Amino acid sequence: MPKKTKARILHVDDNQDTRLLMAAVLGDAQYGVMTAGSVAEAMQLASEIEFDLFILDIRLDDGTGIDLCRKLREVQPNVGVLYYSAYASDQEQQRALAICGDAYLRKPVGIADLEEAVANLLAKKGIGVAEDSTEETPATQPPA
């Protein structure tokens, strides 16, 4: 029986501290996390690597999370999308989910709530956390 591999997550946020925190938290939860600081960087990574989940900020320096979701779904149509943002009103949250996306968390959120949302979205896709995986997907950050 083949071993499960780590679920691959791409987190896109223009705030470097948020990217580092997300990579650390989800890495500790046994996910393989890569980060991007822009729409352009996210699209580059998504064209090279197959992901299981995208975690997107709504407001990015070079676009919106909603527009990025649409673009990412063109490249990887079956990947779950979790919005993670501090800027959304109830209306904006509903709009984002109606257009493109599977779930929404408003910053700040507790670690347990974040891990639960990620696990639930991955479970809907039939993906669990790897146990004793030999595959390593390092947490990364864009160059300074």
Model region roles, listed by residue range:
Residues I66-P77:
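Short amphipathic alpha-helix used as the core "switch/output" element in two-component signaling
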Residues S38, T64-D67:
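Acidic catalytic/metal-coordinating carboxylates
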Residues Q91, V109-V118, G126:
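C-terminal output helix
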Residues Q16-M34:
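Two-component/phosphorelay signaling modules centered on CheY-like receiver
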Residues D67, A88-L105, E116:
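Alpha4 helix (beta4-alpha4-beta5 surface) of REC/receiver domains from two-component response regulators
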Residues T35-L53:
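Acidic, metal-coordinating helix/loop segments flanking the phosphotransfer/catalytic sites
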